[in-house]
């Protein structure tokens, strides 16, 4: 994707010719931008939508901030957390067209409700790896329980995203006064601002409390942790709620 973006940038730089007949659009001042933000954020229904969908993206953000360290600390370096990040876009690519067609005639709030009901199930699924005593065998293949439940949980997140994405901007535009739909659609993405701040801070807190860095533990506890990663014993009690 980075290579494709670079090629596109070069093509635009070399071949794009601006339309000389096009009129120059008026640029909003800072005051006008702030006035538009106040108009949007003072709408209680719109603000509620921002905060609700921020919770959705915060769960996903918290996962991606915490997942690499969580996998390495609980399963070991044999398991590559960077591969887990590909599951969500794969699920979205496979199912987004089908789900978008399915919810095409739904009310926006119904599609959003389905997504909001699914997203906590993804967190429960990923936490359920602690219920397994050993590796999971599927079609003769042994899979670490963290890997198995991560795949399930991230897949649920991808499906939830397919239900949310086609409709939440439509619902946001419905809250706007006539002629202000563009302003509301622009500020609808404020949800990611709140989501990433919360997800970033919360992921660090959860890791430190429930899945600490092995190097910060007592030598005996670190040795027990290293042995557990090699399958030579249980995880120390410091990781019992991870």
Task: Specify the residue positions occupied by each region the protein language model found.
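Symmetry-related core transmembrane helices of the 12-TM Major Facilitator Superfamily/SLC fold
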Residues: 1-14, 241-242
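Juxtamembrane intracellular "pre-TM" segments in multi-pass secondary transporters
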Residues: 21-50
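Helix-to-loop junctions at the C-terminal end of transmembrane segments
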Residues: 94-114
């Amino acid at each position: 994707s980075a290579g494709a973006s670079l090629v596109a940038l070069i093509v635009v730089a070399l071949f794009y010719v601006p339309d000389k007949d096009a009129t120059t659009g008026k640029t909003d001042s800072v005051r006008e931008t702030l006035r538009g933000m106040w108009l949007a954020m003072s709408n209680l229904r719109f603000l509620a939508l921002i905060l609700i969908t921020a919770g959705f993206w915060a769960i996903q953000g918290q996962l991606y901030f915490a997942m690499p360290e969580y996998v390495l600390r609980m399963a070991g370096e044999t398991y590559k957390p960077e591969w887990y990040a590909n599951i969500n876009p794969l699920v979205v690519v496979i199912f987004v067209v089908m789900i978008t067609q399915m919810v095409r005639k739904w009310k926006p709030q119904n599609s959003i409700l389905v997504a909001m009901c699914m997203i906590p199930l993804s967190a429960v699924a990923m936490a359920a790896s602690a219920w397994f005593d050993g590796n999971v065998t599927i079609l003769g293949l042994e899979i670490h329980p963290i890997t198995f439940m991560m795949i399930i949980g991230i897949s649920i997140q991808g499906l939830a995203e397919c239900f949310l994405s086609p409709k939440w901007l439509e619902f946001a535009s419905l809250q706007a006064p006539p002629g202000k739909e563009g302003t509301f659609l622009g500020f609808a993405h404020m949800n990611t601002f709140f989501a990433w701040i919360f997800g970033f801070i919360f992921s660090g807190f959860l890791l430190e409390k429930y899945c600490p860095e092995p190097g910060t533990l007592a030598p005996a506890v670190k040795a027990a942790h290293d042995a557990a990663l090699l399958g030579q014993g249980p995880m120390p009690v410091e990781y019992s709620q991870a």
